[in-house]
Swiss-Prot record:
It is a single-pass membrane protein. InterPro entries: Erv, Erv_C, Erv_N, Thioredoxin-like_sf, Thioredoxin_domain. This is Protein disulfide isomerase-like 5-4. It comes from Oryza sativa subsp. japonica (Rice). Coiled coil: none annotated. The keyword Transmembrane applies. The chain crosses the membrane at residues 444-464. Acts as a protein-folding catalyst that interacts with nascent polypeptides to catalyze the formation, isomerization, and reduction or oxidation of disulfide bonds. May play a role in storage protein biogenesis. The keyword Cell inner membrane does not apply. The lineage of its organism: Eukaryota, Viridiplantae, Streptophyta, Embryophyta, Tracheophyta. It comes from the Eukaryota.
Length: 485
């Protein structure tokens, strides 16, 4: 068995009796300075160990979501009706998707962006296959021409007033005209305005009655509206819509539709309507249509990772639009690319790279307003977006790799005057390259080694300085004593 005396012989730290040591003020001061230096350097080393150290490189895009890219958006149009608002997607490969509805929701709003009801559900609008009679015949005007002066009186005089808002330059309006006039004559013969008066057909020339058409928010021609007791508003689950006709436009189809409108109306309703006309009190539930009608469009679309565009416009396969009356001013609440990041993932992103994330939703909060007028008519608003993907690879306590993918983009917008119907275009161009940010792990053993080096180094340097200072003072004293002798 090894004796204790032999173990003591390998002691690196032999003790000197305290009685044989001497303390000094200079040594005490230097010890305090050394202790403070140790604490300061230890804090700096600990901060450096806890800090994130990353490396950044640019590589070819290696997205985990394949060749498709998700676009989330929330846009508010104070002057574009949900009735005709359409979301279209196209790209350079020839993809052309029109009027996307599966992943898009629409909400009617007023000019102040306040919702006026629940989600807009236009219902199944049939495809108009008959835009008029096959054989065009010359018919005398059977419908009543209306203007701003007599519109209100007619709408309150008859239980049902069906109005064709048209434009003489519109191809579809001209196709409808013969069958509309013929239908109006047939309904006059069946329901004489003087004797029966349950229904009457009328027309409004929107090129002459601009304010009247704007008051009823007519954006497409022809628009056939049904007015009951002075209003064309109908309530559907708390949502107010304009009651419109979307069916075929030949005489037979029009007459059949008109018959359904008067089927449940008693014959003496015309007299009751006249009595209601004399009563100046207005039913609050039958308020007139708002001066403007807007639409909030939100949802997402999936596009290929090639240059393309998302277009929002007024679209219909059986209506024409006056470009000077279409205003695509809009507010951007959200327009972002890629999957939505959770709060936890976003904090992880900011921890690794504080400068990333500021352009994830670059257009959010921006507004693009075009004032209505001749000078600002036919204005298309275009946004050019260049997208760059950032991928972060991080090692945490779970010892598992986590991939955080985030898309950022730059945006340049412009207002373009055109002869065509104004639209909003979001041109996007994904970059074939991506930024790869990798967190570099730090060794705990390296941290301990540095801490030991700091403590030992400061202690050793302080000891050397104290020895030099002490020996210098002793030498000076010897010299002074030698001079006095």
């Amino acid at each position: 068995m090894i004796s204790s005396s032999k173990l003591k012989s390998v002691d690196f730290y032999r003790k000197i009796p305290r009685d044989l040591t001497e303390a000094s003020l200079s040594g005490a001061g230097l010890s305090i300075v050394a202790a403070l230096a140790m604490v300061f350097l230890f804090g700096m080393e600990l901060s450096n160990y806890l800090a994130v150290n990353t490396s950044t490189s640019v590589i070819v895009d290696r997205s985990s979501d394949g060749e498709f890219l998700r676009i989330d958006f929330n846009l508010s149009f104070p002057a574009l009706s949900c009735e005709f608002a359409s979301v279209d997607v196209s790209d350079v490969l020839g993809t052309n998707r029109l009027n996307i509805t599966k992943t898009v929701r629409k909400y009617s709003i007023d000019r102040n962006l306040v919702p006026t009801g629940s989600e807009f559900h236009p219902g199944p609008i049939p495809t108009v296959s008959k835009h008029g009679d096959d054989v065009e015949e010359n018919h005398d005007d059977g419908s009543v021409p209306l203007s701003s002066r007599n519109f209100d009186s007619y709408s309150h005089q008859y239980p049902v007033l069906v109005v064709n808002f048209y434009a003489p330059w519109c191809y579809w309006s001209n196709r409808l005209k013969p069958s509309w006039e013929k239908t109006a004559k047939i309904m006059r013969e069946r329901y004489d305005p003087e004797m029966d008066g349950r229904i009457i057909l009328a027309k409004v020339d929107c090129t002459e009655e601009i304010d009247l058409c704007r008051r009823h928010h007519i954006q497409g021609y022809p628009s056939i509206r049904i007015f009951r007791k002075g209003s064309d508003l109908k309530e559907n689950q708390g949502h107010h819509d304009h009651e419109s006709y979307y069916g075929d436009r030949d005489t037979e189809s029009l007459v059949a539709a008109m018959e359904t409108y008067v089927a449940n109306i008693p014959k003496d309703a015309h007299v009751l309507a006249l009595e209601d006309k004399s009563n100046k009190t207005v039913d609050p539930a039958k308020r007139p249509a708002p001066l403007t009608s807007g639409c909030r469009i939100e949802g997402f679309v999936r596009v290929k990772k090639v240059p393309g565009s998302v277009v929002i416009s007024a679209r219909s396969g059986s209506h024409s639009f006056d470009p000077s009356q279409i205003n695509v001013s809009h507010y951007v609440t959200q327009f972002s690319f890629g999957k939505r990041l959770s709060a936890k993932m976003f904090n992880e992103l900011k921890r690794l790279t504080p400068y990333v994330g500021g352009h994830h939703d670059r257009l959010a909060g921006q507004s693009y307003i075009v004032k209505h007028g001749d000078v600002n008519a036919n204005v298309t608003i275009e946004h050019y977006l260049q997208i760059v993907k950032t991928e972060l690879v991080t090692l945490r306590s779970s010892k598992e790799l986590k991939l955080v993918e985030e898309y950022e983009y730059t945006a340049h917008s412009s207002l373009v005057h055109s002869f065509y119907v104004p639209v909003v275009k979001f041109h996007f161009e994904p970059s074939p390259m991506q930024v790869l940010v990798t967190e570099l792990p730090k060794s705990f053993s390296h941290f301990i080694t540095n801490v030991c080096a700091i403590i030992g180094g400061v202690f050793t340097v302080a000891g050397i300085l104290d020895s030099i200072f002490h020996n210098t003072l002793r030498l000076v004293k010897k010299v002074e004593l030698g001079k006095n002798i």
